């Protein structure tokens, strides 16, 4: 089975609205690995790894976000497996500190 790894940037009103917790829930429910974190510029960054169709579906979900968010843009690019090393030990999906 092939595996996709995408790094995603989400911009808009995506901090202070439960966006990271929502991403963690959706990604875990989809069986994805990776992480999500706030960035100091007000965006949210995420890494999703898993079956290509599940990763694509997650990126599509990110375009909508939770009800209290407003997503202005979502961009993604292929990432290397080494990016998964940012996760906390023993976790498949982590909410990381702000960078």
From Swiss-Prot:
Residues at the catalytic site: 20, 38
Disulfide linkage: none
Keywords on record: Hydrolase
Pfam families the record matches: Acylphosphatase (PF00708)
Signal peptide: none
Entry GO MF terms: acylphosphatase activity
Gene3D superfamilies: 3.30.70.100
Domain Acylphosphatase-like: 5-97
EC number: 3.6.1.7
InterPro entries, sorted: Acylphosphatase, Acylphosphatase-like_dom, Acylphosphatase-like_dom_sf, Acylphosphatase_CS
Reactions catalysed according to its record: an acyl phosphate + H2O = a carboxylate + phosphate + H(+)
NCBIfam families, A to Z: PRK14421.1
Family that this chain belongs to: Belongs to the acylphosphatase family.
Descriptive protein name: Acylphosphatase
Gene symbol of the encoding locus: acyP
């Amino acid at each position: 089975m092939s595996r996709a790894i995408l790094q995603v940037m989400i911009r808009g009103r995506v901090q202070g609205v439960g966006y990271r917790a929502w991403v963690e829930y959706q990604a875990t429910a989809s069986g994805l690995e990776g992480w999500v974190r706030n960035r100091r510029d007000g965006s949210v960054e995420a890494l999703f790894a898993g079956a290509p169709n599940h990763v694509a579906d997650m990126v599509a979900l990110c375009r909508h976000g939770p009800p209290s968010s407003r997503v202005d843009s979502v961009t993604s690019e292929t990432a290397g497996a080494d990016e998964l090393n940012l996760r906390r030990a023993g976790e498949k999906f982590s909410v990381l500190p702000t960078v």
